Amino acid sequence: MKTRVTELLGIRYPIVQGGMQWVGRAELASAVSNAGGLGTLTGLTQPSPEALVSEIERCNSMTDAPFAVNMTIFPSITPPPYEAYIDAIVGSGVKIVETAGNKAIDFWPKLKAAGISIIHKCVAVRHALTAERLGVDIVSIDGFECAGHPGEEDIPGLVLIPLAARALKVPVIASGGIADGRGMAAALSLGAEGVNMGTRFQVTREAPVHAEIKQALVRANERDTRLIFRTLRNTARVFRNAISEEVVASEKLGCQFEDIRHLVAGARGRKALESGDTNEGIISAGMVIGLIDDVPTCQELLERMVRECREHLARAQSYCQ
């Protein structure tokens, strides 16, 4: 397939594995890239910039294809050493970086000076226009269906994708609610030139996630997500389990972050992914879990998606004859 996204990134298919905390490691990123998509290492999954350098080296040993590093950068009372992580990425020769967060802008000049292509994740067209004006190469637009942080305006992809495609000159990648070739065909028809998937790649054989977590997501339906942190205006879409239900109940009663910190700690979420206990912690998941019913290899997934995409685009075209 050929779009501006495949041309800019040097990949065979316009399919991107989004950054996922604890999941975006070398075994998954390399498998996606080897299958013709763009794999992504999650920078802050690594405990230090030095560990990130080692993970980049490990990924390089597993694929000759391009891959990206994700850096999610938000204001924080005790932020990680973002500058050192960025320096590690630049020094390792990575050529593609996916950024997210309103403080990512501070690091774009350094990335651009190093010849790095920037994909920036946005949940609103006005933010995407600012990112375009400041020089990002590609915008990844997240609809309300997505896992992680969909923003506070609840605009679904069916509206957000064409709005972004109409407003922007840079290529748009559609993110949120996509798991198969049907969704990919829809995204391309709406004006996107690529798709981004997180939850779908979490449920592949190569994903470094316990098999029971993968099977729980396979068994789930589209109603099995919850929105947490709504009252804190930092909304996140996560898998419905005992922990997320307790968080939602606490928010309904009125709570501060400190009241639920012990429930949502990142270490608990990581333990859940590694142990297979679905009720151990918060597990990120999008509404797309309703469309996931198997655990393929990344190669099988991408080849199937591209085949289905072509079939659905051809079928839609036949209606116009």
Indicate residue ranges for each PLM-predicted region:
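Active-site entrance/lid segments in N-terminal catalytic domains of soluble metabolic enzymes
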Residues: 1-167
